[in-house]
């Protein structure tokens, strides 16, 4: 939940660019409570319901390439706290040491099964665990690695007022992000200077328009975007 007072925020978030977003969210505590309850209940239910799917995907991943079933990486969530995000592994073993921390289209590190999982966004399913643990929400700014968060402007830091999310309007808008990075000579640099600002503009707009019902709409829009 959101802290009660602006001055209770971590020092790095106590800047004037963040204050307007805090005030907006502070007036919508009922929606924030509904969001929190919905996240935990829905995540628990889906983990139980989808357990057979988890098993099938785990077998497919292990048979396709060497490595663990799950990929775990340090990301940043509410108030700048770091956590380990869970995903189904979609890349070759030790992929992070072989290239950028974001992927581009036709990235050679992505496995055959991994490509299928990514196209259907099934690699994100283990994040239900993160939601249940309170690290993430169904809807919110996608969690970035610390390196990218260090490039945030003061206003961008407002996205850290809420837990990171599995999906968002920005995620839907930039669902083909890897194509934008395909021809980049320096993928990390292009992501930070060109892609990230656009995504954060959408994320900040989402905070201004936040409501529990808007979250539900975003979840429905995400499902429709995946099916298209």
Regions found by a protein language model. Name each.
Residues 57, 100, 139-141, 147, ...:
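Short, hydrophobic secondary-structure boundary micro-motifs
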Residues 7, 11-14, 71-109, 170-196:
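Short, glycine-rich, amphipathic interfacial segments at transmembrane boundaries or analogous
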Residues 25, 47, 101-105, 160:
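Residue-level "hotspot" positions that anchor or transmit function at local structural transition points
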Residues 2-6, 161-228:
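C-terminal terminal-structure detector
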Residues 41, 107-112, 197-203:
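Bateman (tandem CBS) regulatory domains
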Residues 104-169:
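A short, structured surface patch at a secondary-structure boundary
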Residues 3-5, 14-16, 22-95, 130, ...:
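A hydrophobic, helix-centered structural microdomain
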């Amino acid at each position: 939940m959101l802290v009660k007072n602006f001055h209770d925020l971590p020092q790095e978030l106590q800047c004037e660019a963040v204050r307007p977003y805090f005030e907006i969210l502070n007036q919508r505590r009922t929606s924030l409570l509904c969001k929190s309850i919905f996240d935990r209940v829905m995540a628990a239910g889906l983990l139980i319901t989808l357990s057979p799917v988890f098993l099938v995907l785990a077998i497919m991943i292990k048979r396709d390439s060497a490595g663990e079933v799950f990929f775990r990486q340090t990301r940043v969530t509410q108030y700048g706290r770091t956590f380990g995000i869970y995903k189904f592994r979609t890349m070759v073993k030790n992929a992070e040491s072989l290239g950028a921390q974001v992927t581009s289209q036709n990235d050679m590190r992505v496995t055959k099964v991994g490509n299928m999982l990514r196209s259907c966004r099934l690699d994100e399913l283990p994040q239900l665990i993160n939601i249940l643990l309170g690290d993430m929400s169904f809807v919110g700014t996608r969690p970035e690695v610390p390196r990218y968060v260090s490039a945030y402007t003061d206003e961008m830091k407002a996205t850290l007022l809420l837990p990171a999310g599995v999906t968002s309007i920005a995620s839907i808008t930039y669902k083909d992000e890897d194509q934008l990075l395909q021809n980049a000579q320096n993928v990390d640099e292009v992501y930070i200077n060109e892609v990230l600002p656009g995504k954060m503009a959408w994320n900040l707009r989402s905070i201004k328009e936040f409501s529990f019902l808007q979250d539900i709409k975003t979840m429905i829009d995400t499902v429709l975007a995946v099916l298209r």
